[in-house]
Amino acid sequence: MIKKIKTSILTLLNVIAHPLEKLWSDEKDIKYLDIFPPVFIIGSPRSGTTVLYQLLCKHLQFGYINNFVSNWPKAPVTATKLYERFSKNSNPIDLKSEFGNSSYMSGPSEFGEFWYRWFERSHRFKFDNNNIKKLRIEISGLTKIHQRPLIFKNVVHSMRILSLRKIFRESLFIVLERKKLDIAQSILNARIYLYNDKNHPFSVVSSQDQLDPKISYERAIISQINSIYSNIDLAEDTLGKDKFIFVSYKDLCENTEKILKNIQNELEKRNQNIPFNKNKVPDKLKYSTGQKVSDEDYKLLKNEIKKYDRIK
């Protein structure tokens, strides 16, 4: 009940605040997108994208959208200016999260409602009303405030790559990869935890199998994962390998500092110079792998993966 009231109040306040964005909108600011092109973290849900996002926001000098600003999807530039001006929140970014949501108002956000202003639920960009130009102006306004490249993490962007690259011509994509069976188990556990229903869709819809009630949950989950990475592969073939940086979740956990430095080096090769902050990078993180579901579910998911690999 309290959450619904909060949402209703924020929705009303966003409508009121939206006209203020025009005060800061300047087409000349689009030049900042060439100076500081955005970087997008993509991959399957439950692949480790959130912890990579937190690590990069904490240890490299990226700009990012925090949880406070995320509450203002229709007035993000105004909200960022207010936050920069008045916030005394100095909570450090921690590496805790719950299904993509980080802690504190200062924590990195997926910024989901903002992106749905510009994209359909089918992942198609809303091309009407000169939206490409409007979105570029809005993101460039945020970039101007931060004076550094913005990094965004939202797994739905895995299905929007070509549109994002068309809008942000110099943008780059960091792809998280993890063992498929580990991802599948984590998605299944998320379905059970959030909905108490193994068949309830979770996170990005990348395949119609996810929405077909006649299809088994193990097939729907594996189809979801496969469709996401197939779309990333297609985008890589279309745009070129140099637009993508691939990161192994296992390597990230077992050699955290080394992988962050590798990412920094790869960005530098692509003309993105992102210095490290002075805080200490952890040597490694807990690597979660192995069986996390019942024997029956584990067998079903494993067999479904093998079935796909045989077809492939």
Segments predicted by a language model, with ranges:
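Conserved phosphate-donor/acceptor-positioning beta-strand/loop module used by diverse small-molecule
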Residues: K153-V155, L164-N189
